[in-house]
Amino acid sequence: MQKKLLSGLFWVLLANLIVKPFWMLGIEVGVQNTVGTEMYGFYYAIFSFTYIFNILLDLGVTNFNTRNIAQHPQLIGKHLSGILGIKIVLLGLYLMVTFGVGLLMGYGSEEFRLLGLLTLCQFLNSLILYLRSNFEGLLLFRWDSLFSVLDRVLMIVICGSMLWSPLRERFNIYWFVYAQLAAYSITAVLALAVIGNKAHLKRIRFDRRFLLVILRKSAPFALLVLLMAAYGHIDSIILRPLAGDGQAGIFAGAFRILDALSMIAYLVSVPLLPVYSRLCKNGDRQQIANSTSTVFWPMMGGAIVAALGCSLCAEPLMTLLYHENGITYAPAFRVVIFGIIPIGITYIFGTLLTAGGYLKHLNRFAAISLGLNIAVNLLLIPRYGALGSAWASLTAQSFMAVAQLALAIRLFRLPPNTFRLPQMSDIKQIIKIIKTNNDTL
């Protein structure tokens, strides 16, 4: 199982480390510099709004499906046709709620125009994540790796052709959203074609009984995703009305590198969930400890080095990305970048607790984290703006990480050597597995 885990990590990280840094630090930064901080802050606030309600497109189905297919792969054909029907029903619910809350928040025509486009992007992205969960559950990590970056590759091609051409002078935030919409659409169609062929999908089923059964089983996952999305993205939603589009744009810019690093941590958790799910089903505590040890120090070592390095070089790094405006991003960036350490802990031990079914505990921790985030934001934003939101984000992430780490050690009785530094034999094993993967290309 460790071989499966390392193989999965190799393929997922290889694909994403090639593509996603270029997307985040090349295309997204290029878009923000082109359209301006305030317009990008407006976009980012609406995006965060749609992201928080994104759970209504899924209701925990994706995480439930990864765990369920990993433990019962023979169910993929039945579940694929039924869950696709559920996704279409959930789209209607998502649209009603997002537009309804938008009305209550006093959104105008410009907000609703952007909101409509971004809700479609969120639906397609949610559909892609669900389709990928089937590859993950079957431990088909090469296919998962391909579809984890295909949308970004297409966006790079589309946006790059506009940003680095005479079209740059006319480029606006809506072109950026249209590019996302096109890329997500192509990726979703291709992913559906591949997994549909493997599962012998003939049609999409709208089965009320199946819908209720799946949603009841996935409800705890849904609540967890909602709470984590809220405490991870509530900052800019609170920041915009209290401090304006400019401060929201500064926070978005400071948050971007953390977002890129968080994506790497997330990618480590992608193969972890199906692997942990199978190990928890078998009750193999020793293998759970071994798998945790395999990823703990690479994750923590990388997170600590990245946080310290980025914080020490905050001003030159922000100036490199945002030119003359970079110095205004540095104070918030110095704080928020340390969030990668608790985020890394969360992606390891939160994934383990999810695989073990300890969702009640995770939901309680996430609710407390959300409360902390809101309280610190309301306390600090009036005086410190984006910097206050940075402290709020770090506070919430840190509480969540410490709580999950302590609970995982207690419930799974993880021995002290789980957290030891990797030995030379571990490194040799990783190199051997990577070499084997290269030989089979």
Identify what each model region corresponds to.
Residues 1-5, 169-177, 189-232, 275, ...:
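Interhelical loop/hinge segments that connect adjacent transmembrane helices in multipass membrane
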Residues 4-62, 95, 99, 121, ...:
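Signature of the first transmembrane helix
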Residues 7-20, 46, 55-102, 285-307:
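Membrane-water interface segments that mark the loop-to-transmembrane alpha-helix transition
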Residues 24, 28, 57-74, 137, ...:
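Helix-loop junctions and terminal segments of transmembrane helices
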Residues 37, 102-118, 245, 285, ...:
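Interfacial segments at transmembrane-helix termini and the short loops linking adjacent helices
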Residues 47-55, 224, 228, 232, ...:
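Transmembrane helix-bundle signature of multi-pass secondary active exporters and lipid flippases
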Residues 68, 124-147, 337-368:
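Membrane-interface junctions at transmembrane-helix termini in multi-pass inner-membrane proteins
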Residues 112, 116-119, 145-197, 368-372, ...:
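Hydrophobic alpha-helical transmembrane segments
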